[in-house]
Design a protein with these regions (language model features):
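Charged, low-complexity, helix/coiled-coil-prone segments
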Residues: 13-23, 49-64, 149-150
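Short, P/G- and charge-enriched loop/turn segments at secondary-structure junctions
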Residues: 24-26, 40-41, 129-133
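Short beta-strand segments
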Residues: 33-69, 83-86, 96-98
């Protein structure tokens, strides 16, 4: 619940009420979510939804996602930059509206991984540890997802 200040009577001292404001499913809600569903297009035209971890990029309305370099989502993004994103839970159940986006493969950086460690904390560190143990850390691909202007 977000509180909004609202004057009651201007003639006397100004009093403020707490008025709940219900936010629409906007970029703000997407940015504060733990996961979003990344919808990518296959060569046959069908679409695949994948729940992913993400962090905001320095650019406005842009996020970073990482995946295994051989994963289906990376292959699909190589073929089609068109994507859609929506807020979701850990299992991929969509909780918000789909928003058109553009996805591209980019080079990874330590700063981006530091942002993932900061956002996801211990869970990411455990995931990262086992990734290093299995040698999978060398097979990561960073994806930049930019929400299309409305």
């Amino acid at each position: 619940m977000i509180l909004r200040q609202q004057p009651v009577d201007l003639k006397t001292s100004i009093q403020w009420l707490a008025v709940p404001v219900i936010l629409s499913d906007s970029l703000m809600q997407l940015a504060t979510a733990q996961y979003f569903s990344l919808r990518t297009k296959k060569k046959d035209g069908s679409q695949v939804d994948t729940p992913v971890w993400f962090v905001p990029a320095p650019e406005e309305q842009t996020y970073h996602v990482f995946a295994n370099i051989g994963s289906g989502k990376v292959k699909r993004i190589r073929n089609f930059a068109e994507a859609y994103v929506a807020r979701c839970d850990i299992r991929g159940k969509v909780l918000g509206e789909w928003q058109a986006a553009h996805a591209e493969l980019v080079a990874e950086s330590d700063a981006i991984y530091a942002t993932f460690r900061s956002k996801y904390g211990l869970i990411f560190r455990i995931f990262d540890f086992f990734s290093w143990l299995g040698g999978k850390h060398k097979e990561r691909q960073m994806i930049r997802v930019t929400i299309d202007a409305e």
